[in-house]
C-alpha cells in the first residue's frame, strides 16, 4: 500500500517557549568537533540518541542555562517527506494553555537537520502496559479515558484532528514532577486541519483516501477509505481503551501476503466483530461509548461531555477515588538519564506509524518519548 505524503512550569526558563529559529547550531567554544558535543539554539546541548523513526532521530538534550533535560527531535533538512516544521506549526496552533501537551522550547535549523526541542516526558502508555503485564484495571483505564477525552476535545477545539491514536503517543509526566500523573498527548506528525483556515468551513467528505494512522486502533471508516474527522479520533480511542482492558484486540496477529491484504483483514475483522462481543464481560458503558462514536456523522461535533460523564458516572458507581493511583504506581520505571528516574519519556521513538506492525511490540522499553514520525502511513500494530 502506498504511504500517502501528508496532507497535510515547571520553572522559568531563559529561552522563550516556542522560540523559532535563529539558525543556531554550533559546538560550544572550547569543545572540539571530535568531542561530539553539539548545540541546538543558544543553550540546548545535544546528548545521546534515545530513539529514531522515519523522521530522523530523537536525542536526549540539556538546557545549559537551567540544567533541565529536554527531548530534541532531529529531521534531515533533505528529508523526502519533511514534517517537523508542520508539527511545530501544529504545536503553536495548539498553544501552551492546554493541559497534557508538551512544552515546545525551540525550532530551527541545525547543520543538516531541522531541530525541535521539547519538554522531556515520562514513558508511554504502551511502556507502562508492558510494565503491568499487559492488562490495566478498569480504574486505571477510566482515569486514562476521562483525561484523553479532554485532550482530544482540546485538540479538536483548535481545528485539528489527531489521526494517530496509539498507546505509544500518550505519555505520563516525568517522575517527581508535579505533572507525573497527567496523561500527555504527543506527536502531531499526522494531524490535519479539519476546518479550512481560509473558508472556516469543515473539510469536505471524501472517499478513496489512503490509510493514515495505526491499523490496530483506527476507525472502521478509515479502513473503508473515508476522510477522517473528529468521530474517527474518538473511535480509535475506544479501540485503545478496550485493548487496555482486554490485553489484546480480536484483529491482532492476522497474517496476509501483503500489507494491503493485512489491512483489509484487520478492517474486515473489525467490522465483523460486534461491539457486544468486543466489550463482553466489561461494563456496558464501554459498548455505549463505541456505539455512540460509530454513529456520529462525518461533520458532527461529538458530545464530549456526554462521553466523559459515561465514564465518570461508572467510576463513581464502582466506588473508585480519582487519586491517580494507576496500576504502574510503585513499579520501577527505567529512564534514559540514569538517576533522573522517569524521564523515561525519553522513550525511543518508534513511530512505526511508518513501519507496519501487527504483532506485539518488541521494541526496547520506553519506546516513545516523542515518537513522532514524519511520514504518514498506517501502522500495523
UniProtKB/Swiss-Prot annotation:
The organism of origin for this protein: Macaca fascicularis (Crab-eating macaque)
Stored Pfam families: CK1gamma_C, Pkinase
Family: Belongs to the protein kinase superfamily. CK1 Ser/Thr protein kinase family. Casein kinase I subfamily.
Function field: Serine/threonine-protein kinase. Casein kinases are operationally defined by their preferential utilization of acidic proteins such as caseins as substrates. It can phosphorylate a large number of proteins. Participates in Wnt signaling. Regulates fast synaptic transmission mediated by glutamate. Phosphorylates CLSPN.
Major site of localization recorded for this protein: cytoplasm
Gene: CSNK1G1
Keywords annotated in UniProt: ATP-binding, Cytoplasm, Kinase, Nucleotide-binding, Phosphoprotein, Serine/threonine-protein kinase, Transferase, Wnt signaling pathway
Assembly behavior: Monomer.
Subcellular location: Cytoplasm
Sequence ranges assigned to domain Protein kinase in this UniProt record: 44-315
CDD domains: STKc_CK1_gamma
PANTHER family, alphabetized: CASEIN KINASE-RELATED
GO CC annotation terms, alphabetical: cytoplasm
Gene3D superfamilies documented for this protein: Phosphorylase Kinase, domain 1, Transferase(Phosphotransferase) domain 1
Name the UniProt record assigns to this protein: Casein kinase I isoform gamma-1
UniProt keyword Transmembrane, yes or no: no
Catalytic residues, chain numbering: 164
PTM annotation, UniProt: Autophosphorylated.
Region (Disordered): 1-36, 351-381
Biased composition (Low complexity): 368-381
Feature: compositional bias, Basic and acidic residues: 1-13, 351-360
GO BP annotation list: Wnt signaling pathway
Residues the record lists as binding ATP: 50-58, 73
Enzyme Commission designation: 2.7.11.1
GO molecular function: ATP binding; protein serine kinase activity; protein serine/threonine kinase activity
SMART domains named among the record's database cross-references: S_TKc
Amino acid at each position: 500500500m502506498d504511504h500517502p505524503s501528508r496532507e497535510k512550569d515547571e520553572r522559568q526558563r531563559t529561552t522563550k517557549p516556542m522560540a523559532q529559529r535563529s539558525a543556531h547550531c554550533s559546538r560550544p567554544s572550547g569543545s572540539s568537533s571530535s568531542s561530539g558535543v553539539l548545540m541546538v539554539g543558544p543553550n540546548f546541548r545535544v546528548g545521546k540518541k534515545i530513539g529514531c523513526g522515519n523522521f530522523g532521530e530523537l536525542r536526549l538534550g540539556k538546557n545549559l542555562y537551567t540544567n533541565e533535560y529536554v527531548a530534541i527531535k532531529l529531521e534531515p533538512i533533505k528529508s523526502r517527506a519533511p514534517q517537523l516544521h508542520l508539527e511545530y506549526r501544529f504545536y503553536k496552533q495548539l498553544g501552551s494553555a492546554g493541559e497534557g501537551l508538551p512544552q515546545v522550547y525551540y525550532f530551527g535549523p541545525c547543520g543538516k537537520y531541522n531541530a525541535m526541542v521539547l519538554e522531556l516526558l515520562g514513558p508511554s502508555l504502551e511502556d507502562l502496559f508492558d510494565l503491568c503485564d499487559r492488562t490495566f484495571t478498569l480504574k486505571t483505564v477510566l482515569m486514562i479515558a476521562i483525561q484523553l477525552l479532554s485532550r482530544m476535545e482540546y485538540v479538536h477545539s483548535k481545528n485539528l484532528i489527531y489521526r494517530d491514536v496509539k498507546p505509544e503517543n500518550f505519555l505520563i509526566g516525568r517522575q517527581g514532577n508535579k505533572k507525573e500523573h497527567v496523561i500527555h498527548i504527543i506527536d502531531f506528525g499526522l494531524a490535519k486541519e479539519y476546518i479550512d483556515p481560509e473558508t472556516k468551513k469543515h473539510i469536505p467528505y471524501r472517499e478513496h483516501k489512503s490509510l493514515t494512522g495505526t491499523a490496530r486502533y483506527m476507525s472502521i471508516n478509515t479502513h473503508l477509505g473515508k476522510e477522517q474527522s473528529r468521530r474517527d479520533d474518538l473511535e480509535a480511542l475506544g479501540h485503545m481503551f478496550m485493548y487496555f482492558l482486554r490485553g489484546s484486540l480480536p484483529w491482532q496477529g492476522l497474517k496476509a501476503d501483503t500489507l494491503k491484504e493485512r489491512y483489509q483483514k484487520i478492517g474486515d475483522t473489525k467490522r465483523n466483530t460486534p461491539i457486544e462481543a468486543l466489550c463482553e464481560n466489561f461494563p456496558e458503558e464501554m459498548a455505549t461509548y463505541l456505539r455512540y462514536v460509530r454513529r456520529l456523522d462525518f461533520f458532527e461535533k461529538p458530545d464530549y461531555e456526554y462521553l466523559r460523564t459515561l465514564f465518570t458516572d461508572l467510576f463513581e458507581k464502582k466506588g473508585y477515588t480519582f487519586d491517580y493511583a494507576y496500576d504502574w504506581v510503585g513499579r520501577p520505571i527505567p529512564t534514559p538519564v540514569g538517576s533522573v528516574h522517569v524521564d523515561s519519556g525519553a522513550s525511543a521513538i518508534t513511530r512505526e506509524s511508518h513501519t507496519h506492525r501487527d504483532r506485539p511490540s518488541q521494541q526496547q522499553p520506553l519506546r516513545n518519548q516523542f515518537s513522532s514520525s514524519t511520514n504518514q502511513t498506517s501502522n500495523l500494530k
